[in-house]
Curated annotation (Swiss-Prot):
GO cellular component, one term: cytosol
Gene Ontology terms for molecular function: DNA binding
Quaternary state and interactors: Homodimer.
The keyword DNA-binding is assigned to this record: yes
Keywords: Cytoplasm, DNA-binding
Keyword Aminoacyl-tRNA synthetase: no
Name this protein carries in UniProt: Nucleoid-associated protein sync_0026
Domain of life: Bacteria
Family: Belongs to the YbaB/EbfC family.
Length: 113
């Protein structure tokens, strides 16, 4: 440590370098997550929803046989597919963030840290 309890210049420079690298990697990760298409399905597979790695809705597919079962069945299957897609998408995001930060335990909001 340098005077006044401050780290030496080399340590400070290294910390800034690491911060810049994490920022660049985070931007790249953001682009990768945006490009992902993560599928979630209802238990019977007749409803599917795709989200990006950032939980942005991309598309929905409903089997015509599901539609003939009425509104309640269609809504339940659609919700199940959405929950599945959301869980997979947030899980993917969390894994990728942990890879990016190298286990720094940043306690990011919404990331279960």
């Amino acid at each position: 440590m340098a005077g006044f309890g401050l780290p030496n210049f080399g340590q400070l420079t290294e910390a800034f370098r690491k911060a810049q690298q994490i920022q660049q990697d985070a931007q790249k990760l953001q682009e990768e997550l945006d490009a992902m298409e993560i599928e979630g399905n209802s238990e019977d597979g007749r409803a599917s929803i795709w989200l990006s790695g950032n939980q942005q809705p991309l598309r929905v597919r409903l089997d015509p046989s599901l539609l003939s079962e009425g509104q309640e069945a269609t809504e339940a299957a659609t919700l199940a597919a959405l929950q599945s897609a959301y869980e997979r998408s947030t899980g993917t995001m969390k894994e990728r963030m942990e890879e990016l930060t190298g286990g720094l335990n940043l306690n990011l909001p919404g990331m279960g840290g």
